[in-house]
Each structure stands twice: as structure tokens, then as C-alpha cells.
Design a protein with these regions (language model features):
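Cell-envelope and extracellular/periplasmic
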Residues: 1-162
């Protein structure tokens, strides 16, 4: 309502981009990982159709929960590898050229949190300074999440343009 934010009275918000940072639960089983690439493509089409924005910029943060040290790759043929491949494949869809950007998140890892994690229970006071969760949530590392957010923001700015 205009009464809640008077400075924005009459302003119509615009959705300028869409950010996808999901995929962990999709790596399990056989069906979801195998269908991830096709599903990702359908998601982009559906979001754009539903929002009436045929070229809406889309940024995808590829699953990276396997890559604590920043250099690891998911096990070949694993559900994780299939999900990540499906996410990154959106960079190569001709109709998405210049409007979709997917990037890997494992290289952005927090190496300090990764080094402490194996002994987090014994060194809890040290651990809670750098992490707050298990590996499937990027170690709960604010550094890792902020790097992902920065990379996503930079990718979106490139897609949206000046």
C-alpha cells in the first residue's frame, strides 16, 4: 500500500532478474538428477512466461557443497555431478545466450571453515567463529555465502547491463 511506504507512492516495482540457488535435494535418487537439465530449462521458460518477461535475466549458483577445499569436483556420475552439469548446461542453451549465467560455487569455498570442520565437535569454540552447519549447507560459512552472493550479484549486473 502507498500508505506503508509513502516515498514509493505510485511506483510500480519491476522484476529485473531471477536468482536460483537450489539443487541439494535434487541430487538424490535416480530420476531427479537425470532430469535436472531438462527441468532447469523448463523452469526458466515457465518463470519467464508467468512473469511476462521473455528475456528475464537468470543467474544460477551451481551446487558446490562437495567442494570444501575449492578444487574438488563431484564424483563422476553421481547425482551431485548430474545436478551441477544440468545447472551449468544452461550457459550453452542457444536461446538463453546473453540472458542466463550459471556459475560454480565450490571454488568460492571458505578454506578456513573447511580446515576446522573435521574436528568441529572437539574445537567448537573455534568452529562457531567460522561455521554453523554441516557440509550440505556450505558449512554455514558466512564467508562462503557472501562469496556466492557477490558472484551472483556480479553475474546479474552483467546480464542486466547499465
Amino acid at each position: 500500500k502507498d500508505t506503508l511506504f509513502p516515498a514509493l507512492a505510485g511506483h510500480r516495482p519491476e522484476i529485473a532478474g531471477f536468482f536460483w540457488f537450489q539443487g541439494f535435494n535434487d541430487q538424490f535418487g535416480d530420476a531427479a538428477p537425470a532430469a535436472y537439465e531438462a527441468g532447469m530449462k523448463h523452469l526458466i521458460h515457465d518463470v519467464r512466461k508467468d512473469l511476462g518477461a521473455a528475456t528475464l535475466p537468470v543467474v544460477i549458483a551451481g551446487i558446490g557443497t562437495f567442494g570444501w577445499d575449492g578444487t574438488a569436483k563431484p564424483q563422476e556420475g553421481s547425482g551431485t555431478a548430474k545436478v551441477l552439469a544440468g545447472q551449468l548446461a544452461m550457459n550453452d542453451v542457444p536461446e538463453f545466450a546473453g540472458t542466463v549465467r550459471a556459475f560454480e560455487t565450490a571454488p568460492l569455498s571458505d578454506k578456513e571453515a573447511a580446515a576446522i570442520f573435521p574436528t568441529w565437535q572437539k574445537n567448537f569454540e573455534e568452529w562457531k567463529k567460522v561455521g554453523s552447519d554441516r557440509p550440505y549447507h556450505y558449512l554455514g560459512s558466512g564467508i562462503w555465502y557472501s562469496r556466492i552472493g557477490t558472484a551472483a550479484g556480479e553475474a546479474m549486473v552483467e546480464l542486466v547491463g547499465p
